[in-house]
Amino acid sequence: MGKEKNPGRGKNRIELKKGTINIMKKLEEYVISIPDFPEPGIIFRDITSILQDPDGLKLAIDSLLAMVKDVDFDVVVGAESRGFIFGTPVAYALGKAFVPARKPGKLPRETVSMEYALEYGTGTIELHKDSIKPGQKVVIIDDLIATGGTVEAIAKLVEELGGEVVKICFVMELAGLKGRDKLQKYDVDSAIIYEGK
């Protein structure tokens, strides 16, 4: 018998069934927390530890697939760079297109760009001008929501190109940084929610 995936009861669980054995795993078990990095008082949540474990990676992708299973959409947009890692398998599994949102100068064709605020200064994100067609329904995927600035800028670019953002998905959320506040008009979901910063 193969493995079947079912969304768990909470936002951060995926239930795996193997034969008659029912195994519940929490995705956060795969995240290594590093205290006092990059500065004292900060707990750094290392998402790369999810990627290094085959079960952790599968749980992360299955979590994202569960978030979009009832969503009607055409395109996945992934934010540079870990949004590529998590967004591409979702697009592949569901037979959807994948569009990379990149930093300036990385896309070879004509682009549209949006500047957004960072903690110290500003950043810019770009999409190919022809990557989203008017009327297309878009799911945006990224690894982490902190302040929400990057994904807010991507959503605005999608809308500028005539697309509709129907869902935004994250593997991890740092709720203390209030990134959701910038994304209130969108349907936002996170696999893991940490209450702190």
Placement of each model-derived feature along the sequence:
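Ser/Thr/Pro/Gly-rich low-complexity, intrinsically disordered segments
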Residues: 2-9, 13
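Short, Lys/Arg-enriched N-terminal segments with co-localized hydrophobic residues
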Residues: 11-23
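Active-site-facing substrate-recognition patch
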Residues: 22-75
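PRPP-dependent phosphoribosyltransferase catalytic core
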Residues: 23, 27-29, 152-197
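Conserved acidic residues
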Residues: 74, 136, 166
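Short Gly/Thr/Asp-enriched flexible loops that form oxyanion-binding sites at enzyme active sites
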Residues: 85-94
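Short, glycine/charge-rich flexible loops or terminal/linker lids adjacent to PRPP-binding catalytic cores
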Residues: 97-139
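Conserved G/P- and acidic residue-centered "switch" motifs that form tight phosphate/ATP-binding loops
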Residues: 143, 148
